[in-house]
């Protein structure tokens, strides 16, 4: 590289944008905050770099052989990562299970957790 060479600069151009007017935040569900109407996804890194994933690229990744191959050293979880076993599940007797009237709700509703107040 010679000392007399100069770097050429490309002229700057405006980035094409399209604005979509949303009348209410209800039109954009929380899961769609990082998507565009065309289906492009974007995210940012902790350093502030914006990564843009085109819909076409994501659809190609979905059909790639790598996406259909399970990861190495995946634990065997019956019914999740491996087929369910043919053994019937162990039945616990009623004396082994603690039951309280709070656990049995009308209409099949069960509490997610217990809280002492």
Curated annotation (Swiss-Prot):
PTM section of the record: Phosphorylated on serine and threonine residues in response to insulin, EGF and PDGF. Phosphorylation at Thr-36, Thr-45, Ser-64 and Thr-69, corresponding to the hyperphosphorylated form, is regulated by mTORC1 and abolishes binding to EIF4E.
Motif (TOS motif): 113-117
Motif YXXXXLphi motif per UniProt: ranges: 53-59
Compartments it resides in: Cytoplasm; Nucleus
PTM sites of type Phosphoserine: 43, 64, 82, 95, 99-100, 111
GO MF entry, a single one: eukaryotic initiation factor 4E binding
Modified residues (Phosphothreonine): 36, 40, 45, 49, 69
Disruption phenotype: Mice lacking both Eif4ebp1 and Eif4ebp2 display increased their sensitivity to diet-induced obesity. Mice lacking both Eif4ebp1 and Eif4ebp2 show defects in myelopoiesis: mice display an increased number of immature granulocytic precursors, associated with a decreased number of mature granulocytic elements.
Glycyl lysine isopeptide (Lys-Gly) (interchain with G-Cter in ubiquitin) crosslink, residue number(s): 56
GO biological process: cellular response to dexamethasone stimulus; insulin receptor signaling pathway; IRES-dependent translational initiation of linear mRNA; negative regulation of translational initiation; regulation of translational initiation; TOR signaling
A GO cellular-component term linked to this record: cytoplasm
Modified residues (N-acetylserine): 2
Region annotation (Disordered) ranges: 1-47, 64-117
Modified residues (Phosphotyrosine): 53
Tissues expressing this chain: Highest expression in fat cells.
Pfam families with a match to the protein in the record: eIF_4EBP
UniProt KW keywords: Acetylation, Cytoplasm, Isopeptide bond, Nucleus, Phosphoprotein, Protein synthesis inhibitor, Translation regulation, Ubl conjugation
Phosphoprotein is among the record's keywords: yes
Chief place of localization: cytoplasm
Compositional bias of kind Polar residues: 1-12, 33-47, 81-99
Subunit description: Hypophosphorylated EIF4EBP1 competes with EIF4G1/EIF4G3 to interact with EIF4E; insulin stimulated MAP-kinase (MAPK1 and MAPK3) or mTORC1 phosphorylation of EIF4EBP1 causes dissociation of the complex allowing EIF4G1/EIF4G3 to bind and consequent initiation of translation. Interacts (via TOS motif) with RPTOR; promoting phosphorylation by mTORC1.
Protein function: Repressor of translation initiation that regulates EIF4E activity by preventing its assembly into the eIF4F complex: hypophosphorylated form competes with EIF4G1/EIF4G3 and strongly binds to EIF4E, leading to repress translation. In contrast, hyperphosphorylated form dissociates from EIF4E, allowing interaction between EIF4G1/EIF4G3 and EIF4E, leading to initiation of translation. Mediates the regulation of protein translation by hormones, growth factors and other stimuli that signal through the MAP kinase and mTORC1 pathways.
Similarity comment: family membership: Belongs to the eIF4E-binding protein family.
Description of its domains: The TOS motif mediates interaction with RPTOR, leading to promote phosphorylation by mTORC1 complex.
Protein's name in the database: Eukaryotic translation initiation factor 4E-binding protein 1
Annotated source species: Mus musculus
């Amino acid at each position: 590289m010679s000392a007399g060479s100069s770097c050429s600069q490309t002229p700057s151009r405006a980035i094409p944008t399209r604005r979509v007017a949303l009348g209410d935040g209800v039109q954009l569900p929380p899961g769609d905050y990082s998507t565009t109407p065309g289906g492009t996804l974007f995210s940012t890194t902790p350093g502030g770099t914006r990564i843009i994933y085109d819909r076409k690229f994501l659809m190609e990744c979905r059909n790639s052989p790598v996406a259909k191959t399970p990861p190495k050293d995946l634990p065997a979880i019956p019914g999740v990562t491996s087929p369910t076993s043919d053994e019937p599940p162990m039945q616990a007797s009623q004396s082994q299970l603690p039951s309280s009237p709070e656990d049995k709700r009308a209409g099949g509703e069960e509490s997610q957790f217990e809280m002492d107040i």
